[in-house]
Swiss-Prot record:
Originating organism: Drosophila melanogaster
Binding residues for ATP: 280-288, 303
Top-level class of the enzyme under EC nomenclature: transferase
Top-level taxonomy: Eukaryota, Metazoa, Ecdysozoa, Arthropoda, Hexapoda
Disulfide linkage: none
Biased composition, class Low complexity, residue ranges: 108-162, 181-200
Name of the protein in question: cAMP-dependent protein kinase catalytic subunit 3
Catalytic activity annotation: L-seryl-[protein] + ATP = O-phospho-L-seryl-[protein] + ADP + H(+); L-threonyl-[protein] + ATP = O-phospho-L-threonyl-[protein] + ADP + H(+)
Amino acid sequence: MDLWHIFLERILVACRVSASVFANFGCGLYSSWKLICGDHDSASGLRAGLATPTQRGKATGDNGTTGTPARTIGKPQARIATAMSTATCARFCTPLSSGTAGSTSKLTTGNGSGNTMTSAYKIPSNNSTTANDSSNTETTFTFKLGRSNGRSSSNVASSESSDPLESDYSEEDPEQEQQRPDPATNSRSSSTATTTTTSSADHDNDVDEEDEEDDENEGEGNGRDADDATHDSSESIEEDDGNETDDEEDDDESEESSSVQTAKGVRKYHLDDYQIIKTVGTGTFGRVCLCRDRISEKYCAMKILAMTEVIRLKQIEHVKNERNILREIRHPFVISLEWSTKDDSNLYMIFDYVCGGELFTYLRNAGKFTSQTSNFYAAEIVSALEYLHSLQIVYRDLKPENLLINRDGHLKITDFGFAKKLRDRTWTLCGTPEYIAPEIIQSKGHNKAVDWWALGVLIYEMLVGYPPFYDEQPFGIYEKILSGKIEWERHMDPIAKDLIKKLLVNDRTKRLGNMKNGADDVKRHRWFKHLNWNDVYSKKLKPPILPDVHHDGDTKNFDDYPEKDWKPAKAVDQRDLQYFNDF
């Protein structure tokens, strides 16, 4: 009898152990499946709507529309294609957290139809940490897709913070909180996104401490941070979120009209001066329309942003910041802002109409560019970046989608929602995953060096057909960026390869373009030695691609959008309208 008891007890123990093992194994399998197959695609916002695979970058579409591949990559030669707009307003920002490496952050995502879901991910570990990475807090981000069949770049993120002006912050404006009006925003133009953390740790308290640490590290390098060399002069140039004089002038004008100095004198602009012809792009809280100036008969692009959505998504300051920067700059390779205004429901910005479409579309159709073609476009981008950096402006959103080709074949950089005037460094966590610099991922604070990193990624993508850091999941992309390992094509131009290597240096103090000679170091590289940079600026070089357009108002290089799908924006009340008094 005792033997039977012992035997039965051992069987029961074995059964319990087996049940426990199988239960844990099942839970582990389910968690892994949910994390890999479920949450990441939704949480990253990289796949939005119907998708079809592409081979060697050839774009496909659905329902008769012209498709353009999204930025999610499974293999180097196979991307996800979605029916999308080549709108000038399309872009996205991937969620990043400033928490401790290894800590967990939540993502709450939307699918464009109002549904949301929450996902968790861990911040990639890295040997170097910063003073502000001491808090192990959870941060929640809410994503809203711009449209179900749209580009992954039309996502908008906003913090769960109740303060709408909870915006990006930087070393150069530590008093930003005191300058806020009653309700505030983290604003982006059109369909962009930024992330703001709701960490309980006060980041500003760590700024000075981290500066000392970084300055010591930078002093040990062979290079010198270009921002350190220009710091003194940039202080007098820096402005906080706009020009006060301009704002006062705007207040004196009516909401739907204003006076602008032109070559022929002062012109009084009115919204009625513009005839809307066709929608050429849509975004999260607005659309871009081709329109004609009834007075000059010139074609232009009108970006229309719904104020209710701009406020809801906390994008006020970014929209205003974009307008203020574009109003200040003039360069042959940068989109020109002609006029901006508002009514009781929308914000309006009038730009040059660039009828050739996105460089991204031409690159996907070609698969990859030759070294000569890539050199031409890279040179024009270098010219534009040098100009922006001379004004202490960091662009932060360089990618083929934001490069438009004009009828004459030359580039126009568009979409300045992430651009910002700097004194030293900024802490906004934003960008396109494949183009984000390591210092952004590590939340160290970043400066104009991130634009030179993005240029290296862009040159690589033009030559190879896909970015140097790719993965099915954005977090895999971040890990590869931090590792710095790049797979090189066997037959890549060795001189171009050398330039890319010098641009994709993880230590920003040794990154080409960010040392004491600034952009001159890039312009003197052997890959550009045949160029006369005055000829580049004057557009004297022969473009490698001439868009197929028949007139200045041609829209064949943009997708078609049913006008009936566009619903008028709701008017905002006077309390909300005050946010845009200076627009």
